[in-house]
UniProtKB/Swiss-Prot annotation:
It is found in: Secreted. Its main location: secreted. It comes from Cyriopagopus hainanus (Chinese bird spider). SUPFAM superfamilies: omega toxin-like (SSF57059). This is U3-theraphotoxin-Hhn1a 7. InterPro entries: Huwentoxin-1, Huwentoxin_CS1. Keywords: Disulfide bond, Ion channel impairing toxin, Knottin, Secreted, Signal, Toxin. Residues 25-52 form a propeptide.
Length: 87
């Protein structure tokens, strides 16, 4: 009976230790993806979108004219692709 209690205690202690170790390693790993994503999606001045004289797809067309290949939606006031069913 004592042997069974000791083995259950050791098993439980081992599971607790495994949980603590995995939690510690996971908390360290959580910072890595955040740092990696922030470096990937960092906005660089060379890659910023240039200001256009026309509005592109799904851009507001109240003040600007739509770029070639797009028309201003009369309902939503966005630049959309022209289609036969749109008036």
């Amino acid at each position: 009976m004592v042997n069974m209690k000791a083995s259950m205690f050791l098993t439980f202690a081992g599971l607790v230790l495994l949980f603590v170790v995995s939690y510690a390693s996971e908390s360290e790993e959580k910072e890595f993806p955040k740092e990696m994503l922030s470096s990937i999606f960092a906005v660089d001045n060379d890659f910023k979108q240039e200001e256009r004289d026309c509005a592109g797809y799904m851009r507001e067309c109240k003040e600007k004219l739509c770029c070639s290949g797009y028309v201003c939606s009369s309902r939503w006031k966005w630049c959309v692709l022209p289609a036969p069913w749109r008036r």
